[in-house]
Amino acid sequence: MTEGAILLLAPDRSYRTAAYVHAATSLDIPLVVAAWGAADLSLPGQGIRIDSSSDESALKTIREVASKRRFIAALPTDDSTVALCQKAAEMLDLPANAPEAVEASTNKLIFRELCRDAGVATPSFQRVQINDTSK
Protein backbone atom coordinates (compact mmCIF):
# COMPACT_ATOMS: atom_id res chain seq x y z
CA MET A 1 0.00 0.00 0.00
CA THR A 2 1.22 3.49 -0.85
CA GLU A 3 1.98 5.82 2.07
CA GLY A 4 0.14 8.78 0.55
CA ALA A 5 -2.65 9.49 -1.86
CA ILE A 6 -2.66 10.63 -5.45
CA LEU A 7 -4.47 13.89 -6.10
CA LEU A 8 -6.44 13.64 -9.35
CA LEU A 9 -7.66 16.94 -10.79
CA ALA A 10 -10.65 16.51 -13.06
CA PRO A 11 -13.26 18.73 -14.67
CA ASP A 12 -16.88 17.97 -13.90
CA ARG A 13 -18.13 14.82 -15.64
CA SER A 14 -14.89 13.99 -17.44
CA TYR A 15 -15.22 10.63 -19.12
CA ARG A 16 -11.57 10.00 -18.26
CA THR A 17 -12.00 10.08 -14.48
CA ALA A 18 -13.51 6.59 -14.24
CA ALA A 19 -10.43 4.97 -15.79
CA TYR A 20 -8.17 6.62 -13.21
CA VAL A 21 -10.48 5.60 -10.37
CA HIS A 22 -10.62 2.02 -11.66
CA ALA A 23 -6.83 1.82 -12.02
CA ALA A 24 -6.21 3.22 -8.54
CA THR A 25 -8.75 0.84 -7.02
CA SER A 26 -7.26 -2.14 -8.87
CA LEU A 27 -3.76 -1.23 -7.67
CA ASP A 28 -4.90 -0.38 -4.13
CA ILE A 29 -3.61 3.18 -4.48
CA PRO A 30 -5.41 5.83 -2.42
CA LEU A 31 -6.93 8.47 -4.68
CA VAL A 32 -8.53 11.83 -3.96
CA VAL A 33 -10.46 13.39 -6.84
CA ALA A 34 -10.52 17.19 -6.89
CA ALA A 35 -13.27 18.28 -9.26
CA TRP A 36 -15.53 21.18 -9.99
CA GLY A 37 -19.18 21.16 -10.91
CA ALA A 38 -22.39 19.83 -9.49
CA ALA A 39 -22.11 16.14 -10.47
CA ASP A 40 -21.55 13.53 -7.78
CA LEU A 41 -17.89 12.88 -7.13
CA SER A 42 -16.45 9.59 -8.36
CA LEU A 43 -15.34 8.55 -4.89
CA PRO A 44 -17.90 9.51 -2.24
CA GLY A 45 -15.99 10.70 0.81
CA GLN A 46 -12.74 10.69 -1.17
CA GLY A 47 -13.38 13.75 -3.30
CA ILE A 48 -13.14 17.48 -2.91
CA ARG A 49 -14.92 20.28 -4.69
CA ILE A 50 -12.73 22.98 -6.18
CA ASP A 51 -13.62 26.31 -7.75
CA SER A 52 -13.07 26.23 -11.53
CA SER A 53 -13.29 30.00 -11.80
CA SER A 54 -10.36 30.72 -9.48
CA ASP A 55 -7.04 28.91 -9.33
CA GLU A 56 -6.32 30.75 -6.08
CA SER A 57 -9.50 29.40 -4.48
CA ALA A 58 -8.94 25.90 -5.85
CA LEU A 59 -5.37 25.86 -4.56
CA LYS A 60 -6.52 27.07 -1.14
CA THR A 61 -8.96 24.15 -0.94
CA ILE A 62 -6.29 21.69 -2.04
CA ARG A 63 -3.84 23.13 0.53
CA GLU A 64 -6.45 22.67 3.29
CA VAL A 65 -6.97 19.02 2.35
CA ALA A 66 -3.21 18.47 2.05
CA SER A 67 -2.74 19.73 5.61
CA LYS A 68 -4.70 16.67 6.76
CA ARG A 69 -3.76 14.16 4.07
CA ARG A 70 -0.40 13.55 2.44
CA PHE A 71 -0.26 13.57 -1.35
CA ILE A 72 2.55 11.81 -3.22
CA ALA A 73 1.58 12.90 -6.74
CA ALA A 74 -0.84 15.16 -8.59
CA LEU A 75 -2.29 14.16 -11.96
CA PRO A 76 -4.60 16.00 -14.36
CA THR A 77 -7.22 14.08 -16.33
CA ASP A 78 -7.83 16.62 -19.09
CA ASP A 79 -6.27 19.62 -20.84
CA SER A 80 -8.44 21.92 -18.75
CA THR A 81 -6.79 20.74 -15.51
CA VAL A 82 -3.14 20.55 -16.63
CA ALA A 83 -2.15 24.09 -15.59
CA LEU A 84 -3.94 23.91 -12.23
CA CYS A 85 -2.38 20.52 -11.56
CA GLN A 86 1.09 21.93 -12.24
CA LYS A 87 0.44 24.75 -9.76
CA ALA A 88 -0.93 22.34 -7.16
CA ALA A 89 2.05 20.02 -7.51
CA GLU A 90 4.49 22.90 -7.08
CA MET A 91 2.55 24.21 -4.08
CA LEU A 92 2.65 20.74 -2.47
CA ASP A 93 6.34 20.29 -3.33
CA LEU A 94 5.58 17.35 -5.62
CA PRO A 95 7.20 16.61 -8.98
CA ALA A 96 5.68 18.91 -11.60
CA ASN A 97 6.11 19.81 -15.23
CA ALA A 98 7.70 23.12 -16.09
CA PRO A 99 5.23 25.83 -17.18
CA GLU A 100 6.66 25.58 -20.72
CA ALA A 101 5.84 21.86 -20.79
CA VAL A 102 2.31 22.58 -19.60
CA GLU A 103 1.86 25.10 -22.40
CA ALA A 104 3.23 22.67 -25.00
CA SER A 105 1.01 19.84 -23.77
CA THR A 106 -2.12 21.92 -24.24
CA ASN A 107 -1.22 23.73 -27.48
CA LYS A 108 -0.91 21.56 -30.58
CA LEU A 109 0.98 24.16 -32.60
CA ILE A 110 3.64 24.70 -29.93
CA PHE A 111 3.93 20.94 -29.38
CA ARG A 112 4.45 20.25 -33.09
CA GLU A 113 6.97 23.08 -33.40
CA LEU A 114 8.96 21.70 -30.47
CA CYS A 115 8.88 18.19 -31.93
CA ARG A 116 9.95 19.44 -35.35
CA ASP A 117 12.74 21.57 -33.87
CA ALA A 118 13.99 18.57 -31.85
CA GLY A 119 14.11 16.37 -34.94
CA VAL A 120 11.12 14.26 -33.93
CA ALA A 121 9.04 13.06 -36.87
CA THR A 122 5.84 15.07 -36.99
CA PRO A 123 3.14 15.55 -39.61
CA SER A 124 3.54 18.60 -41.80
CA PHE A 125 1.61 21.57 -40.47
CA GLN A 126 1.20 25.28 -40.85
CA ARG A 127 -0.31 28.01 -38.75
CA VAL A 128 -3.54 29.38 -40.17
CA GLN A 129 -5.21 32.56 -39.01
CA ILE A 130 -8.97 32.14 -38.95
CA ASN A 131 -9.55 35.67 -40.20
CA ASP A 132 -6.83 35.36 -42.90
CA THR A 133 -8.38 36.51 -46.20
CA SER A 134 -5.12 36.56 -48.18
CA LYS A 135 -5.75 33.18 -49.83
Q: PLM features: what roles do these ranges have?
A:
Residues 1-101, 105-110, 117:
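ATP-binding N-terminal substructure of ATP-dependent carboxylate-amine bond-forming enzymes
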Residues 107-135:
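Active-site nucleotide/adenylate-binding loops and adjacent lid/helix of ATP-dependent enzymes
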